[in-house]
Amino acid sequence: MANVWGVRLADSLSSPTIETRTRHYTLRDFCSDLDAVAGKEPWRPLRNQRTNDIVAVQLFRPLQGLVLDTQFYGFPGIFSEWEQFIKEKLRVLKYEVLRIYPISNYNHERVNVFVANALVGAFLSNQAFYDLLPLLVINDTMINDLLGTGAALSQFFQSHGEVLEVAAGRKYLQMKNYSNDDDDPPLFAKDLSDYAKAFYSDTFETLDRFFWTHDSSAGVLVHYDKPTNGNHYILGTLTQMVSAPPHIINATDALLLESCLEQFAANVRARPAQPVARLDQCYHLRWGAQYVGEDSLTYRLGVLSLLATNGYQLARPIPKQLTNRWLSSFVSQVMSDGVNETPLWPQERYVQIAYDSPSVVDGATHYGYVRRNQLRLGMRVSALQSLSDTPAPIQWLPQYTIEQAAVDEGDLMVSRLTQLPLRPDYGSIWVGDALSYYVDYNRSHRVVLSSELPQLPDTYFDGDEQYGRSLFSLARKIGDRSLIKDTAVLKHAYQAIDPNTGKEYLRAGQSVAYFGASAGHSGADQPLVIEPWTQGKISGVPPPSSVRQFGYDVAKGAIVDLARPFPSGDYQFVYSDVDQVVDGHDDLSISSGLVESLLDSCMHATSPGGSFVMKINFPTRTVWHYIEQKILPNITSYMLIKPFVTNNVELFFVAFGVHQQSALTWTSGVYFFLVDHFYRYETLSTISRQLPSFGYVDDGSSVTGIEMISLENPGFSNMTQAARVGISGLCANVGNARKLISIHESHGARVLTITSRRSPASARRKARLRYLPLVDPRSLEVQARTILPSNPVLFDNVNGASPHVCLTMMYNFEVSSAVYDGDVVLDLGTGPEAKILELIPPTSPVTCVDIRPTAQPSGCWNVRTTFLELDYLSDGWITGIRGDIVTCMLSLGAAAAGKSMTFDAAFQQLVKVLTKSTANVLLIQVNCPTDVIRTIKGYLEIDQTNKRYRFPKFGRDEPYSDMDSLERICRAAWPNCSITWVPLSYDLRWTKLALLESTTLSSASVRIAELMYKYMPVMRIDIHGLPMEKQGNFIVGQNCSLTIPGFNAQDVFNCYFNSALAFSTEDVNSAMIPQVTAQFDANKGEWSLDMVFSDAGIYTMQALVGSNANPVSLGSFVVDSPDVDITDAWPAQLDFTIAGTDVDITVNPYYRLMAFVRIDGQWQIANPDKFQFFSSSTGTLVMNVKLDIADRYLLYYIRDVQSRDVGFYIQHPLQLLNTITLPTNEDLFLSAPDMREWAVKESGNTICILNSQGFVPPQDWDVLTDTISWSPSLPTYVVPPGDYTLTPL
């Protein structure tokens, strides 16, 4: 692909090859043009490409005789008015012409185009035109008829012996709204009255003799191919200029420019069977070459004209409608630095045609063209497939060559090309609804005192922490925050079950008081949650009977100080959204006192057995102590909820069974919850303080930020090396971050802009470089289209990262946390992007192994950085390859699938290979469920029969294994290894990498990624560790025994659950599990630990050895949930009365159950008046269900509400309800299955339509006082005996 100065040419040739036959212009044609029939007018409107307004008109014959100043014509300045004006004028002129030349006699007579143009011009300027009429029809030739006396009849013509001089009439006309705007069409000086003169003669030799004696310093132009109206030369007027910012060009150059662009456009459109009016549209320089230098625009346009005639094409397509902006940019490229890289150079007296040019103009025209046999272009012939402009920047993937430069040289070029400082759009750190975490009271948990609960961080009100919270809040994309939080809290609160009755504490139709209601919400004069709540539009939250509002700022309630006693009345549910910061500010003693007062107000306003929610801005031990002493003894259950919307320590406390005596306490579950809660806050607070401020100006100094460079008129000719170094420098600064390019016109120049983001990760990769690897610019060079720019955005993913990206970030965090300075790393399944280079210290040598070729450069690194292209499951390759730590993320499952191996076989082969390595630590992501197997809809489907994972988003499936099998394979190879199943911490510490790399996170994606991690965990194997021996499987609630050999009596063992210390053998009385004992057997030199756990999950063990308490990893163990098997035993005789049928449910008592119904693919909690769970006198679980005719048309399930995800462990269909045989000899209950209209038929006859407008039940039906429909909002009817069926309408 060649360049002509700054103009890039395509790598193929194309040229028109068929020319249409010349057709004479007749009187009929002339009269038709004067008619100006719609669609056939002799003009074309031109529009501003931004406003779409008509701003100019292109004129065709016979309107090309307008040679006077525009005021002489009296044209309106608005196109619609001009068009009406001109049509009326032309119609009058037509009648004058036909009066002299009746169409019946002169129909096919040839018209002199010169005279036709002059006639129309004279008529429109109200000048004498009758003397021209006798010359309208050609007598001899167009030229000869006007030589001599004819030339004196108009200012249009002038005779010079055998040469006729014709004033070039306007080809364009400006409307009054033409302003030479960037988006206006260019007019190439042809809207001016005297932009050029044309000289006509029968032969070119006569014209040459004429110009021997005349000044030709302006440059004489010629059309050799089918010159319009006869042989002629064009002499542009040097005094007429046209603007193409930053250049001013004369009329001669404007004519050259327009004609060569027309030819370039014709070349792209050329097809073998498509004729054109003229094979060569270009003007060529016939005289005056001695007056133009090679740096002049005239000369360079002459070169481009020669190239266009020979079939060259512009790599950058010419838009269908030119604009001043585009033209200015093109002229700037023509005038930019560079050289003519083609073999063609213009000659003054003829046009060279290369031997292999596709143009046939030399055969069609016998004058002016010479084909040179020795001149060859060596290019293929093919029309360029032009691409339309792209409305936004496009990602660019750099590719590297073996060439290198100094890193400092790259920094220098970046500093010259950078567009910093700039103010980017900030974007959103986090998007989506609340990411909710919760814990509720569990009597099986260990009792914990308020003094043992974690304390609010002492630094919470420090200035830098306030900055971090403020930044997160500003960059958190969300609607009404109160609405999002309230909705999340209500959804969790309404799922709470009273274990004594099996019913929810919160039910439909309860009276509600809303404390802290505000009229200051956008678009509403009350909290936004109230309307959807009362209308039953919040999934899983039934509507209350009423909501009364109290607070300082209410509009639909009572103004009151909620911290003092007031006559509130009693409510079954009190929801308090009162902020303690309003009165308490940052004084914890004042805010804690307010919490106590507000808790008292909630208790006083809640009716016996009711519930309340209380927002706590600052959960201190003082607050927990007050609740422990005053609230817990007077409620039957509680829940803590954190709807994570913005980063703060705010929590919601939910109390159930108010004013009922109990012995509730805080539990270890609350302790673990609060540890995660405070760690989560501190993690995100620390990250936020490292991010640039909201609305910042990026000057390159922040660790995270925008990098942007621009190249003007990037011809990649003389500036190739400098441009490459600058682009390569930017790539070094941003590493693997996404790079976007735009190519557009700016102030007359064509600009290539590359935008990306720097981060601590990219800084680590750059610090590894010794030399700067140079990119291959070809993928940028071939870009001929316009790619429009946009303002850079720091966090630019408006929808947030996908679950798979979040999952990858979790793995990246584990890898970066495991590798320290100087560790030698062996990374398997590296991938072409080699992300590992951004995760590990720049001082750590690394060997990257992948079956795919790397996209990374080689030979440019400070420390050993090796890329091996091979199958790491093959034998023999690892000899001599050093690696202290082996990492393998998101690879082994794919490798096993690619080789049609089971996961066990692939893992065993990997272990076999690694036994010959020098590795101490293995960090491997494995396909292995660590929890109850459940499909993650849309992301992970699990085939338990064939042990396969299927990933629907990628159309890929992989094998999986189980934890015991993988541990056995490891211990067979390394008997003394310790194995840790790296747990996913809910404190979100992994988000540090994501947010500092400007990755927008989504609540929904984070939640799905957390679920996927349970099936795709990271397995850490410390080959030379000290193993612990687990006695059997560890089950929640059962005694678990652990033997740890090889340690001394003074050594201490710590056990961690997520981020929190579960217990330490140094003080087993402070353990956060229900029971733990630790004994040391001096004879055997081993420790024995007996434990009882109340929470399922992964626990990790660490030994603190010796007087220095050196930490040693012992691995981890998994505490499983109890067996999830469940059966429902129905009695032989079903009870269809209101007493209901008792169904024996066999399930582990660990699980709490609720009945659900699936409606339109959505889960809904079933009416607790229909399904009730309770313990029988013998201690077994019983489900009482009241039967309804509608049950046969619904899908009911028993689901557990044990985990963070409802139904995660148990999802058991109640299939019998769909097949029950209804009796016909007793009264039955009947409800509508859903909100649609249903036809009720008895013995096949329709008797009524449920849910129909104005529905009135049959007279022999009664309404049940308390509905037993699945939905409390649908009534239940008592119907007489019969054979009933329901049909949806």
UniProtKB/Swiss-Prot annotation:
GO CC annotations on file: viral outer capsid
Key words, A-Z: ATP-binding, Capsid protein, GTP-binding, Methyltransferase, mRNA capping, mRNA processing, Multifunctional enzyme, Nucleotide-binding, Nucleotidyltransferase, Outer capsid protein, S-adenosyl-L-methionine, Transferase, Virion
Positions bearing the site annotation: Involved in formation of the phosphoamide bond: K190
Residues annotated as binding ATP: G893, A894, A895, A896, A897, G898, K899, S900
Listed InterPro entries: Ig-like_fold (IPR013783), Reovirus_L2 (IPR010311), Reovirus_L2_4th (IPR048604), Reovirus_L2_6th (IPR048603), Reovirus_L2_7th (IPR048602), Reovirus_L2_8th (IPR048294), Reovirus_L2_GTase (IPR048601), Reovirus_L2_MT1 (IPR048598)
Localization per record: Virion
Gene3D superfamilies per UniProt: Immunoglobulins (2.60.40.10), Reovirus components (3.90.1810.10), Reovirus core (3.40.50.10760), Vaccinia Virus protein VP39 (3.40.50.150)
Entry's EC annotation: 2.7.7.50, 2.1.1.56
Reactions catalysed according to its record: a 5'-end diphospho-ribonucleoside in mRNA + GTP + H(+) = a 5'-end (5'-triphosphoguanosine)-ribonucleoside in mRNA + diphosphate; a 5'-end (5'-triphosphoguanosine)-ribonucleoside in mRNA + S-adenosyl-L-methionine = a 5'-end (N(7)-methyl 5'-triphosphoguanosine)-ribonucleoside in mRNA + S-adenosyl-L-homocysteine
Main location: virion
Assembly behavior: Interacts with protein mu-NS; in viral inclusions.
Function: Outer capsid protein involved in mRNA capping. Catalyzes the last 3 enzymatic activities for formation of the 5' cap structure on the viral plus-strand transcripts, namely the RNA guanylyltransferase, RNA-7N- and RNA-2'O-methyltransferase activities.
Family according to the record: Belongs to the orthoreovirus lambda-2 protein family.
Protein name per UniProt: Outer capsid protein lambda-2
Species whose genome carries this gene: Reovirus type 1 (strain Lang)
